Amino acid sequence: MIFSPLFANLGGDISVSRSVAFGVILLMVALIMFIVYFFMDRKLDAQTGEAEEKDEPFKISDIGKILSSYVFWLVALLCVLYYSAIFPFQKYAVNMLQCNLSFTDVAPDSFWATDAVTVIQYVIMIVIALTSFASNFQKNKSMKYALLVTSIVALVIYCYMGFMRQSASAIFAVFPLLAVGITPILGNYVDNKGKAATMLILGSLLLIACHLTFAFILPMFKGSPVGGVIVAYVTILVLGASFSLVPASLWPSVPKLVDANVIGSAYALIFWIQNIGLWLFPLLIGKVLDSTNPQIVEGLANGTLTPEQAAVSYNYTVPLVMLACLGALALIFGIVLKRLDAKKHYGLELPNVVKDEIEGGEAEIVAAEE
């Protein structure tokens, strides 16, 4: 997020292709790492003498078995609704901030206009990620709190630098930072305490609150440069927390709801359904944005508005309410799923490690009897 504008503006000639090329390079690096991992894993299997267990062959009837499951559709629809309110929003979020915040031009010779600030912010992001993530696994309380304080201070510095840059992209880049720190905490909580269905509901509630805040509260601070940025930062961070809550509880819940023999096919179908939403809703948001801002479309068509003027003039209220409605539907499915779990005892509210503990206890009893 933070480097895309930097590459797009290299040399003073704006070109999106450079940012896309940077993304392609990252994907190529990831592919190379996967290939290396694949051969290292094969080598380890050969050294240890372990062979992969033969799975049951895939059958077309498995798909029918999965699609005929009522609970599968609850999870799949909750997934597509939630993620369709997150990922398509990211596409429009920077422009939404440009339309709702009051930015001032930064002097070209100012430190805040240099590329060095972007690099410094990226380093700070890494510091936040490392310290917050490491604090989750630190047993020494003094070190744990020291890492947390370091992470919080770094986050405040990052937010201050984003404000001084007067850049919507720098402000929205804070989105994943809180998620990085709390995702391990939430995952550990689900493993040891459970409450996955409750976390799905809470994540959906936070999602609704954030989109409604962007729709109705943020525009009220249009004339307040500091107040608007503060509201934006807080809302984006809370949205990141929601983005941690749902995945941390959703994906570990699937094996509890689907037969283990078709779990791979179930995940594939969920992602397939999710990608349909990720294709459809960006188009829908664009259509709604144009239909609710006819004066901008007309101004661009007859030349009375330049693209630069139009880009900061859109009213995002209706698209944001639409995304909040997706969150409301996800909330309904989450509530239904929790009630169904209470009735059918799928174990969504139970910790994931209980089964292992029971099996371990049974093994100890058998060993003692022998």
Predicted feature locations:
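Helix-loop-helix hairpin linking two adjacent transmembrane segments in secondary transporters
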Residues: 1-41
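C-terminal transmembrane helical hairpin of 12-TM major facilitator-type secondary transporters
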Residues: 147-162, 167, 173-178, 196-250
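A late C-terminal transmembrane helix in Major Facilitator Superfamily
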Residues: 260-294
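A membrane-interface helix-boundary motif in multi-pass transporters
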Residues: 8-25, 287-327
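Helix-to-loop junctions at the C-terminal end of transmembrane segments
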Residues: 129-141, 181-195
